[in-house]
Amino acid sequence: MSLLTEVETPTRNGWECKYSDSSDPLVIAASIIGILHLILWILDRLFFKCIYRRLKYGLKRGPSTEGVPESMREEYRQEQQSAVDVDDGHFVNIELE
């Protein structure tokens, strides 16, 4: 029998996990944390543009109009639009000599 044949033949215990006691609470906790970390990392990579855009710009929107009567909402929209219209006329042309 050659040495190569003996090396290629695995023993039954060689393929088994050394720490096969899965009832250990530390092993269970580490497995759960590892799986959650992997799931969160995958979601972060898939949706990072949406997530970080919402974090960056989500809080900078105007005040909430929930519970405000429609007439006051329309008045607020008109004020905002008039402020934008006024700002449109304030461009300065600079000519370089």
Curated annotation (Swiss-Prot):
Entry membrane topology: Single-pass type III membrane protein
Residues at the site labelled Seems to be involved in pH gating: 41
Subcellular location: Virion membrane; Host apical cell membrane
Virion surface side: 1-22
Modified residues annotated as Phosphoserine in this record: 64, 82
Regulation of this protein's activity per its record: The M2 protein from most influenza A strains is inhibited by amantadine and rimantadine, resulting in viral uncoating incapacity. Emergence of amantadine-resistant variants is usually rapid.
Single GO BP term: symbiont genome entry into host cell via pore formation in plasma membrane
Stretches for region Disordered: 60-83
Record site: Essential for channel activity, possibly by being protonated during channel activation, and by forming the channel gate and the selective filter: 37
UniProt-recorded Gene Ontology molecular function terms: monoatomic ion channel activity; proton transmembrane transporter activity
Spans traversing the lipid bilayer: 23-43
Lineage: superkingdom: Viruses
Side of membrane Intravirion, spans: 44-97
Primary location group: virion
Similarity remark: Belongs to the influenza viruses matrix protein M2 family.
Oligomeric and partner information: Homotetramer; composed of two disulfide-linked dimers held together by non-covalent interactions. May interact with matrix protein 1.
Annotated domain remarks: Cytoplasmic tail plays an important role in virion assembly and morphogenesis.
UniProt function note: Forms a proton-selective ion channel that is necessary for the efficient release of the viral genome during virus entry. After attaching to the cell surface, the virion enters the cell by endocytosis. Acidification of the endosome triggers M2 ion channel activity.
Additional comment: When the channel is activated, one or more imidazole moieties of His-37 probably become bi-protonated.
The protein, known as: Matrix protein 2
